[in-house]
């Protein structure tokens, strides 16, 4: 809900009224293995309900990460597969933007092997990503992760491409 643009949520850290949940039941997508949280968010947006981000470190809920890289990948594929049922225009737009940007970044990194000018595109993206990530990492007391941003920015486009095509 930051910037009045809610596109993601996590059921472990989501608060809503019983009335909204009851009203949304016929709108949640039964054909998907998971995703009630996202589909509930889409419903609330559709009915012009109020969505806010509670920016308080004490409000964070920690959940267990996947045990293995394989389990992590399967979880992401499952999340990606439910995107076929998304009807929220903002969410679909951002998903397409992330996918197309990832394809562009992967192609530019490969092209940089032959022409170093393509590194400039990666550097621009790194600066933009850092400007978005660093304030959150500082706020959430995860400053130690800042040093991983350059390394992960190289891997991330390929991870997104694999996940998108694995989940479709």
Q: Over which residues does each language-model region extend?
A:
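Low-complexity, charge- and small-residue-enriched intrinsically disordered regions
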Residues: 1-6, 164-168
């Amino acid at each position: 809900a930051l910037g009045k643009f809610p596109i993601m949520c996590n059921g472990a850290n989501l608060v809503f009224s019983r009335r909204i949940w009851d009203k949304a039941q016929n709108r949640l997508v039964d054909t998907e293995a998971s995703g009630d949280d996202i589909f509930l968010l889409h419903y609330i947006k559709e009915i012009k309900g109020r969505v806010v981000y509670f920016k308080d470190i004490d409000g964070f809920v920690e959940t267990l990460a996947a045990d293995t890289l394989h389990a992590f990948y399967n979880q992401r594929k499952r999340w990606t597969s439910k995107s076929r049922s998304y009807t929220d225009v903002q969410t679909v737009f951002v998903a397409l933007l992330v996918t197309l940007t990832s394809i562009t970044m992967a192609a530019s990194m490969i092209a940089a092997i032959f022409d170093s000018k393509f590194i400039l595109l990666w550097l621009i993206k790194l600066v933009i990503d850092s400007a978005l990530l660093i304030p959150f990492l500082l706020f959430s007391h995860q400053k130690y992760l800042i040093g991983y941003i350059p390394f992960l920015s190289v891997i991330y486009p390929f991870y997104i491409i694999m996940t998108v095509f694995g989940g479709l």
